[in-house]
């Protein structure tokens, strides 16, 4: 009835729905489209309804299956409970046979264990063969190692449990030992081939190093276990100090066990072996180079260059494959450097057979190697080990000695040529010879060559060699200067003055450029300054020799002989002398630089003063009023002449001694003598009392007693000024006065 009611309700609902859809007559035309839409919806509803019905059917089937399974399980549980009840009843009857059951159980367990051990022993050869087969694949090296390590574990366990059967068990592990040998040969082959593998198959190298690391860890673990076992044994011996029954056998067994433990504690040492393999590989890499050193230097240096460049690849490819704590790049740098030092020592053994060009090629390669290391981040001090190891010393010695010999031969030829060839003139008329410029051009070239092609230590050696060359050159020039001035001549001496001043400037330039190129630690050991000043000393000597040329002039000698004689008193000496000086000064001023000319004038003035003082002390005529007046006029003539060339203060400071001696010669009393002499000692502290004695002896009318008193008083004044028996300083006059030099020794003996 309910179904019929539902049908009626559905029909009425449908009529209402149609009435809503067709409220107007003109909408009857759309009945066909409405009908089509209705059919489509009906089909969709049918499909959805079919799907829902199917799902409900499947769920009902699953529920039936679960119900059936549950029923089956319940039946099984019921059977099990029944079996348990039966077994419990049976066990109640076995309590009386418990001991026999326990023995049977133990026997069964032992049998199972024995079978398992036998199976394990029988599998050793199979596992060893499998490990050996896996060695053919580089990718399996770690797995192979793990298999072999597992076999080693079995061996340790078996040998520990075997007791007296150890000898019989060892043969089962011989195959394992052979496999280990093959494995280690493969492993160390990979390590030795580190350079090639790092580029072509880095993963193979990494796996090999992983094995090394794993073995190191295992060695550490075994060492710790052995240490713990040893500690436990020691504690046991402390806890049981008296065991008289089995002392000897127990002791021997324990000592043997300890020996085996110590052997195990040492481990395989794979890391050390890894380093050793690398060292051997490096040695093999250098074998060809160390042979080429004796056969073909060019090929040897090319080979060395190629080997040195490998360090870049080692930095980029090899080092990343190794654990950082191995510091493999630093190790490689040390190993390579050691071998290169060996190469340099072999080359040094035949240094005399190598040309300078070949030596420079060797040092040039060392520079390249050092720069390569520095570019790779190696510290400068470590990069320079090759050059500072001493291995290059014979090479550098040979180069430096040849350079010094060649340079010396050259400048000696130049100096000999200067003796016969007239000096050249600049546009300003200054005299010179090419020796100075040529010498420093050659020395500068040597420095530049070494800077461009060699090491810091080689440049340091060249700097020292150049200093020695300059010292030798100065010595050769001094030898030339020491020749009689008249033999040398005015113009060559003027050229020598200019040359040495030019040498000083060039030497300072070379010094500055060389010291700038040297590292500070080497620059501090090189003293160019004193050597450079040596050229100024030679120039100074040449200036004095130029003055001697004037004073050795026959015309000048003729005038000087007349000093303090009749012609001198008549004004026929000093006036003519300064006129001659004027002629010479005109030439010298044109020939030399202004600074040298002023020094020349000062030297000439000093020599003039010395000559006048010397002649004053050696002349035999009594000093009269006209003598004193002429001396005063001489001072004026000399003052007027020399201050045309140098400052008046310099002239006055040098002429002053002539004025003081004039006053001393004209003194009338003891106080006057001592006062003037004291004034002289203030600016000429080396003026001996003998000067007073000579001048007093040339005075008329002074009694002998007064003369002795004056001399004695002056000697006491002089002695009081001495410091440690010597004058506080030396002046320019009295050490050069000839008449005093001859009697100086006896005078000093009297004073002391």
From Swiss-Prot:
UniProt-listed InterPro entries: EXOC3/Sec6 (IPR010326), EXOC3/Sec6_C (IPR042532)
What does the record say about the knockout? Male gametophytic lethal due to defect in pollen germination and pollen tube growth.
Which UniProt keywords are listed?
A: Acetylation, Cell membrane, Cell wall, Cytoplasm, Cytoskeleton, Exocytosis, Membrane, Secreted, Transport
Tell me if Cytoplasm is a UniProt keyword of this record.
yes
Residue ranges, compositional bias (Low complexity): 247-256
Its job: Component of the exocyst complex involved in the docking of exocytic vesicles with fusion sites on the plasma membrane during regulated or polarized secretion. Involved in polarized cell growth and organ morphogenesis. During cytokinesis, involved in cell plate initiation, cell plate maturation and formation of new primary cell wall.
Q: What is this protein called?
A: Exocyst complex component SEC6
Q: Which species is this UniProt entry from?
A: Arabidopsis thaliana (Mouse-ear cress)
